[in-house]
Amino acid sequence: MTTTVDPHAALRDRVYRTLFDGPGESDPALRRTVAENGAVPPDLAAVVDKIHRHAYKVTDEDIARLRASYSDDQLFEIVVSAAVGASRIRLAAGLAALESA
């Protein structure tokens, strides 16, 4: 088995640090938890889960409900964090599969 060196790991890690730990309108801890599909506030749980599992199922109504509690900037950061987190999980699974092949 050959160990694959990921030439893009450093750049990806920089993007993750900026997105999850950088300044923003939403709390960095919330962005990180959303990315990990962890225990988010109840009002976010359904949308975050949809983004992680079936992003195409998120509706305008889902977002409209969240606008009562979150600004557009906060919602943008939350949605992007969930999407990047979901892709990160899938990438890790894919790289692990390649390593074990």
Residue spans for each PLM region:
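Hydrophobic alpha-helical segments
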Residues: 1-101
